[in-house]
Design a protein with these regions (language model features):
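Conserved nucleotide-sugar donor-interacting segment of glycosyltransferase catalytic cores
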Residues: 82-151, 203-204
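Nucleotide-activated sugar donor-binding and catalytic core shared by glycosyltransferases
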Residues: 1-25, 31-40, 71, 100, ...
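Short, charged, surface-exposed secondary-structure boundary motifs
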Residues: 53-58, 131-138, 226-231, 310-312, ...
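Alpha-helix C-terminal capping/helix-to-coil transition sites in glycosyltransferase folds
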Residues: 95-96, 192, 311-312
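Phosphate/nucleotide-donor binding subsite
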Residues: 42, 46-99, 169
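Donor-nucleotide binding loops and adjacent catalytic segments primarily
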Residues: 14, 200-315
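Short internal beta-strands
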Residues: 23-29, 278-283
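Short gly/pro/ser/thr-enriched loop/turn and capping motifs at secondary-structure boundaries
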Residues: 32-34, 50-54, 123, 127-134, ...
């Protein structure tokens, strides 16, 4: 459940499992079921619409504000509004499963269904969300803290969600004939010694090498070439535009709706002109078509195949979702992350720490800020480091590794 960045790795994994002869059913928020089905996956709708929520007035307010407490309040309120319907839908899908795989937002429910069916549960994470001393909770703070405080931030987040959600969870458990849970899924799953697949690269976070086989860092789960071809997301004329000039800088905000598209397009165009580069702008979930500038050096696309297009670019500026970050780094692009919330701040700090990018908050977005952060990345040092990192990332076979872990859990 979540934005496309949350869903696409699951779709890639489901496709790989199906190619191995497994029957796979994926429960998704209703707004992304069509995307998954076009990619050849048996996707079923859950009673939640992430796009509607993010584009609602309340969703827009907390996205624009960047306040973590407001984010938590809205997330908890929206979760409580939809969770009973989501639980019902998930229960209908889980019967007869040999294994249940769940992402962070529905981990409580997914692990409960695995317990009900008496089958293994595997978590699928896009950032280090289990308590650890290396990194703080990506929700609670964007700061690097001493190890005890890093662990404490995870406990704070766990307890906040547990206080707000344990009654709904235990009502769900009772409907399945299970006893009440007395601790959050983080605590229960860690004690049970289960496996959490970390769908990000060890080359980005070498500090977590000590997590071992229970939390393997497999890398980014990417769509197969067949899935990318089936989706056919490149717009007509894009390849010709790319070939007609110098490699552009990519600008995109993915599933984060842009509140003032005309203003944002104008400041991107201004920044690109000052940088002396062409601009490829991915509209994502924002409606920018009515504001497209009449400028041959600026191209706005509603959809695009990131794996196919980004290697033709010179640098990337985006919101810092785990999927977008993995895609731009895999393409060898120095990357500026203009973060909105959650793990986006974390990935922004990561690219800066690795010397392959820079970061600032979306609330600070301006043409001047874009020029100041992007210009140094177009020089040799950051570009060379980004290319070297891409070479290391290319050696990972994340999807096959994840499939092997799942098959091993079922044996």
């Amino acid at each position: 459940v979540g934005t496309r960045g949350d869903v696409q790795p699951l779709v890639a994994l489901a496709g790989a499992l199906a190619a191995r002869g497994h029957q796979v059913v994926v429960g998704l928020n209703s707004d992304l079921v069509g995307f998954a089905r076009r990619a050849g996956v048996d996707a079923r709708p859950l009673s939640v619409d992430a796009r509607r929520f993010l584009q609602s007035p309340s969703g827009q307010r907390w996205l624009a504000g960047g306040d973590v407490r407001a984010y938590l309040r809205e997330l908890i309120a929206e979760r409580r509004r939809v969770i009973r319907g989501v639980q019902r839908d998930m229960g209908l899908l889980a019967g007869g499963a040999d294994v249940v795989i769940g992402t962070r937002l529905i981990e409580e429910e997914a692990s409960t269904l695995a317990e009900w069916q008496r089958v293994p549960f595997l978590g699928l994470h896009y950032a280090p969300v289990r308590p650890n001393g290396r990194f703080a909770s990506v929700i609670v703070t964007s700061r690097r803290l001493p190890p005890p405080l890093n662990r404490l931030t995870h406990t704070i987040y766990q307890r906040r969600l547990w206080r707000s959600g344990h009654a709904d969870l235990n009502a769900f458990r009772a409907s399945l004939g299970l006893p009440p849970a007395t601790a959050p899924a983080d605590v229960r799953l860690t004690a049970a010694g289960g496996t959490d697949i970390q769908a990000y690269s060890r080359f980005l976070l070498p500090e977590l090498a000590g997590w071992g086989p229970a939390r393997p860092l497999v890398g980014n789960l990417r769509l197969s070439p067949a899935q990318r071809a089936a989706l056919g997301e490149d717009e007509p004329g894009l390849a010709d535009w790319l070939a007609a000039g110098e490699p552009p800088v990519y600008f995109g905000f993915g599933s984060m709706p842009v509140q003032e598209p005309a203003r944002v397009l104008d400041l991107i165009r201004t920044a690109a002109r000052r940088l002396g580069v062409r601009a490829l702008i991915g509209a994502g979930w924002s409606d920018m078509t009515a504001h497209t500038p009449q400028d041959p050096d600026v191209r706005v696309v509603s959809t695009m195949d990131h794996d196919g297009v980004l290697p033709a670019c010179r640098a990337a500026v985006h919101h810092g979702g785990a999927g977008s970050t993995a895609a731009s780094l895999a393409a060898g692009l120095p990357t500026v992350i203009c973060s909105v919330f959650s793990d986006q701040h974390f990935w922004g700090r990561t690219v800066r720490r690795l010397g392959v990018g820079d970061t600032f908050r979306y609330t600070q977005l301006s043409a001047e800020r874009l020029v100041r952060t992007t210009a140094p990345l177009l020089a040799g040092g950051p570009a060379d480091r980004a290319a070297a990192l891409a070479g290391r990332l290319a050696g990972e076979n994340a999807t096959d590794t994840a499939v092997a872990l799942i098959e091993r859990a079922v044996r």
